[in-house]
């Protein structure tokens, strides 16, 4: 008999609900997701692990507790910075339970740094990364052509920026050909559109220099020009790129990776096209340099000829040397006159072209004249270089002939000229007798001797 029967009472067994592990975890997960569907959590990143799938896994911790965080690829790719251990952040998402391990976690949809903004952190991170790869190195910078005939500009086709660039280019050199690649300079598609412009000019447009331009703005406004893809497009460009983004105080990743940074779009136009005065000054400087180099070379040959002419071993060769020296002087004079005429003609053609620009606004006609003038300038420069080379070769050949005729060159090989006491050149041992005094002329110095026995 049971205890309850002895007392005369009947006890019913308590009702028990027995859960399967899967069911209880699922129920708790659902309750958590209902109650904590949209929460903000701050903490320090630890155990950061990006997966090959693009998902991000890490923990947020404070002084005593950790919370697992997962951010799926669709949200992770929208981040403007790269999460890393030790970075304090604020995460937004829903609390859930990872059923496989019964582990509490936050499924993050948004992440931002505490303190400094995400864009600034992304800027510093990308700057450090590209600098470590050497993309900012000075030796990578390509020179900007002095007088480009064709310029590519990547910017918005509307607004003050493109007008400022065109106005400066027209004022400094109206014949330059400008191609504009229209691109958004702000917004989600801006970076890819600007990068497409850089690639287009490298493949199809045959331009000599590219200007990437945008007006000033906040770091958010200039975010497209801090894009890694755009930076690498500029770095791999075979055509020199000038970055003209923002105001003078604004710096972007494009500024660091470009071949030249201009403080403003207008300044970029001034840097890429020299004024007529600058061209004249450059031509004058080149003319002076060529003339100075020619004078130095001619002076060297004149000194060498004078030294050879004064040497006692030459004797009757002074007349031949004088004739050759006169020929050298004549060549030098004719070369100087030709050089002066070439540069005078070049300056005159540039003056005529400049006058036509000031009095006519026939852009197509002037462009043709500019192309013709440029071709003639190149032809004149090539002719001048060829003339200089031809004259220099001829002078060197004359000097070589003189050197070959010089007895000094023979003496320097170990031979000697022997003279008797009267200074007559001895060619036969029978010209002297025992006891006669003779003098041997060497390459450096003389030796006197007494004949012991002629043979």
Curated annotation (Swiss-Prot):
> By its UniProt entry, which InterPro entries does this protein fall under?
Exonuc_VII_L (IPR003753), Exonuc_VII_lsu_C (IPR020579), OB-fold_nuc-bd_dom (IPR025824)
Catalytic activity of the protein: Exonucleolytic cleavage in either 5'- to 3'- or 3'- to 5'-direction to yield nucleoside 5'-phosphates
At the top of the EC hierarchy, this enzyme's class is: hydrolase
**Which UniProt keywords are present, listed alphabetically?**
Cytoplasm, Exonuclease, Hydrolase, Nuclease
**EC number(s) for this protein?**
3.1.11.6
UniProt keyword annotation of Metal-binding present? no
Q: Which GO terms describe its cellular component?
A: cytoplasm; exodeoxyribonuclease VII complex
Please name the GO terms of the biological process aspect recorded for this protein, alphabetically: DNA catabolic process
Where this protein primarily resides, as one coarse class? cytoplasm
Hydrolase among keywords: yes
Q: Kindly give the Pfam families that the UniProt entry links to this protein.
A: Exonuc_VII_L, tRNA_anti_2
Coiled-coil stretches are none
Q: From the Swiss-Prot or TrEMBL record, what is one GO molecular function term? A: exodeoxyribonuclease VII activity
Its localization reads: Cytoplasm
Protein family membership? Belongs to the XseA family.
Q: What does the subunit comment say?
A: Heterooligomer composed of large and small subunits.
* Function according to Swiss-Prot or TrEMBL: Bidirectionally degrades single-stranded DNA into large acid-insoluble oligonucleotides, which are then degraded further into small acid-soluble oligonucleotides.
State what protein this is by name: Exodeoxyribonuclease 7 large subunit
List the source organism.
Answer: Koribacter versatilis (strain Ellin345)
**Taxonomic lineage:** Bacteria, Pseudomonadati, Acidobacteriota, Terriglobia, Terriglobales
């Amino acid at each position: 008999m049971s205890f309850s029967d002895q007392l005369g009472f009947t006890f019913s067994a308590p009702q028990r609900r027995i859960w399967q592990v899967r069911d209880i975890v699922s129920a708790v997960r659902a309750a958590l997701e209902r109650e904590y569907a949209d929460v903000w959590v701050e903490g320090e990143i630890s155990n950061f692990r990006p997966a090959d799938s693009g998902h991000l896994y890490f923990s947020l911790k404070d002084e005593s507790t950790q919370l697992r965080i997962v951010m799926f690829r669709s949200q992770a790719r929208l981040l403007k910075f790269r999460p890393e251990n030790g970075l304090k952040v604020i995460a937004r998402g829903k609390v859930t339970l990872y059923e496989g391990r019964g582990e509490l976690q936050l499924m993050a949809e948004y992440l931002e740094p505490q303190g400094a903004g995400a864009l600034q952190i992304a800027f510093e991170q990308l700057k450090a990364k590209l600098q470590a790869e050497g993309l900012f190195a000075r030796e990578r910078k390509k020179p900007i052509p002095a007088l480009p005939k064709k310029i590519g500009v990547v910017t918005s086709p509307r607004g003050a920026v493109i007008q400022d660039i065109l106005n400066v280019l027209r004022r400094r050199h109206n014949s330059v050909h400008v191609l504009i690649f229209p691109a958004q300079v702000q917004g989600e598609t801006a970076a890819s559109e600007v990068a497409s412009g850089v690639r287009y000019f490298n493949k199809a447009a045959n331009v000599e220099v590219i200007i990437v331009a945008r007006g000033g703005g906040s770091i958010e406004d200039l975010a497209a020009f801090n894009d890694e893809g755009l930076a690498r497009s500029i770095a791999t460009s075979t055509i020199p790129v000038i970055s003209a983004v923002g105001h003078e105080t604004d710096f972007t990743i494009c500024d660091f990776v470009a071949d030249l940074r201009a403080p403003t779009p207008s300044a970029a136009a001034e840097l890429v096209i020299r004024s007529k005065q600058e061209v004249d000054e450059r031509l004058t400087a080149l003319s002076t340099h060529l003339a100075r180099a020619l004078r130095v070379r001619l002076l060297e040959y004149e000194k060498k000829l004078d030294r050879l002419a004064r040497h006692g071993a030459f004797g009757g060769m002074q007349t031949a040397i004088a004739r050759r020296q006169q020929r050298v002087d004549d060549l030098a004079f004719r070369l100087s006159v030709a050089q002066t005429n070439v540069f005078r003609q070049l300056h005159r053609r540039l003056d005529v072209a400049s006058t036509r620009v000031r009095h006519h606004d026939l852009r197509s006609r002037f462009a043709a004249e500019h192309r013709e003038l440029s071709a003639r300038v190149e032809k004149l420069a090539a002719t001048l270089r060829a003339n200089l080379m031809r004259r220099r070769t001829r002078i060197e050949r004359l000097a070589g002939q003189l050197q070959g005729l010089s007895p000094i060159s023979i003496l320097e090989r170990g031979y000697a000229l022997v003279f008797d006491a009267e200074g007559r050149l001895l060619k036969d041992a029978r010209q002297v007798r025992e006891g006669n005094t003779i003098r041997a002329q060497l390459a450096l110095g003389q030796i006197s001797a007494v004949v012991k026995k002629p043979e």
